[in-house]
């Protein structure tokens, strides 16, 4: 049975519904358009929830990336496109949950990798395609044969990569250094329930996008 909200919460709700909200929250921005909830960004377009981002567009929740497009939850990435939850990656494309990688395409849950394509769960690997190892020359020839300059060819190989991803289990949770938590993308937190994309949080429930 739902419990009534404490009086303090009711008062806060009334106040929140009465006081006008700002149209956007930004400071120290240079040459940016249609951005919000951002600080210390430069030459950006349609970027939301960003800090120290430069020369980028269509990002949500980014920190300290440069020349990135169409990505979500990126941190210190450069010259990358179409990614979700990537950290310190360079020339990374259409990849998810990757860290410290460069020159990878359509990879998932990979760390410390370079020149990999369509692979999942790799650690410190080079020249892998769909989780199979190749020589440098074989890798370059096979990727060239994919004809990624053609949108039709790329869409076909992307569908193949997504099906390959399904052959590997998803992580129960993305995070580390946690105690008694539930949700996803939780780091350095304790006693935190049903929360998402948080760092350094304790004794909390139902929160998101809190990075201390």
Question: Where are the language model's segments positioned?
Answer:
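Long, distal/terminal scaffolding or interaction modules
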Residues: 1-212
């Amino acid at each position: 049975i739902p419990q009534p909200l404490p009086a303090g919460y009711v008062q806060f709700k009334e106040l929140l519904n009465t006081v006008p909200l700002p149209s956007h929250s930004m400071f120290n921005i240079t040459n940016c358009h249609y951005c919000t909830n951002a600080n210390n960004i430069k030459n950006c377009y349609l970027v939301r929830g960003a800090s120290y981002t430069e020369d980028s567009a269509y990002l949500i929740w980014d920190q300290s990336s440069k020349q990135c497009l169409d990505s979500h939850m990126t941190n210190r990435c450069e010259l990358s496109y179409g990614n979700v939850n990537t950290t310190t990656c360079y020339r990374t494309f259409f990849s998810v949950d990757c860290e410290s990688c460069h020159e990878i395409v359509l990879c998932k849950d990979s760390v410390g990798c370079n020149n990999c394509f369509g692979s999942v769960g790799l650690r410190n690997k080079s020249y892998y395609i769909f989780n199979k190892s190749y020589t440098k020359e074989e890798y370059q020839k096979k990727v060239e044969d994919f004809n990624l300059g053609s949108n039709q060819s790329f869409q076909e190989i992307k569908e193949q990569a997504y099906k390959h991803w399904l052959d590997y289990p998803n992580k129960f949770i993305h995070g580390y250094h946690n105690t008694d938590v539930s949700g996803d993308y939780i780091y350095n937190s304790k006693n935190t329930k049903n929360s998402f994309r948080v760092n350094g949080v304790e004794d909390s429930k139902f929160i998101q996008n809190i990075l201390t």
